[in-house]
């Protein structure tokens, strides 16, 4: 009887090992068919070589004087560093990007004990991508909007000092992804 239990126990262990092996093999076969995608890889037609990113104007009701130049510079830097495109400053560029900051508003986003605890700064940008290399190509409109929460104990200028780098980085990333990614 003791021998029978050992044989039975051994066959159960063998069965478990076989099942685990088959499961691992199945998962590996599924993963082998997957491609690795790079989220920072831009999708640009080969004939496009130059881009003109115009100054992004601030047409929002409230005007943060630092935002327009910093966002424009960050977007230009991102495009030059993560694509093969060359930034030019003339109307002969293959791609022409123009636009403006359309919204820069603060609203209440959190209330605690009947007092404002958190404010939200919402920044929106509207851009147009013009493809001069492809005759008859329609301009592509792009909208990017991000919200940033900050403590209600801060004034707007104090919050802007804390949030400025994050605002510029996040908006530039979103604009870049909408301009060049096929996601």
Predicted features along the sequence, with ranges:
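Sec-dependent bacterial lipoprotein signal peptides
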Residues: 2-34
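Structural motif marking the loop-to-transmembrane transition
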Residues: 14-18, 60, 160
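A structural "domain/chain start" motif
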Residues: 32-76, 80-84, 133, 177-183
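Surface-exposed short loop/turn segments
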Residues: 39, 81-83, 88-141, 146-158
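Extracytoplasmic/periplasmic, Sec-exported soluble proteins
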Residues: 63-71, 113, 117-121, 156-168
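Structured catalytic/translocation cores of nucleotide/phosphate-coupled proteins
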Residues: 74-75, 96-100, 171, 182-183
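Compositionally biased, intrinsically disordered linkers/stalks adjacent to structured regions
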Residues: 160-183
């Amino acid at each position: 009887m003791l021998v029978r239990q050992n044989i039975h126990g051994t066959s159960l262990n063998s069965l478990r090992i076989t099942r685990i092996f088959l499961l691992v093999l199945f998962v590996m076969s599924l993963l082998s068919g997957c491609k690795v995608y790079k989220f920072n890889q831009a999708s640009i037609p080969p004939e496009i070589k130059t881009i003109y990113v115009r100054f992004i104007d601030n047409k929002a009701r409230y005007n943060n004087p630092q935002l327009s130049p910093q966002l424009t510079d960050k977007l230009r830097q991102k495009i030059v560093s993560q694509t093969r495109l060359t930034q030019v400053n003339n109307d002969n560029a293959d791609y022409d990007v123009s636009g403006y900051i359309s919204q820069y508003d603060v609203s209440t986003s959190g209330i605690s004990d009947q007092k404002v605890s958190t404010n939200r700064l919402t920044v929106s940008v509207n851009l147009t991508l013009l493809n001069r290399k492809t005759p008859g190509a329609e301009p592509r409109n792009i909208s990017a909007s991000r919200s940033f929460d900050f403590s209600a104990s801060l004034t707007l200028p104090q919050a802007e000092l804390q949030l400025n780098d994050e605002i510029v980085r996040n908006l530039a990333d979103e604009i870049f992804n909408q301009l060049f990614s096929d996601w």
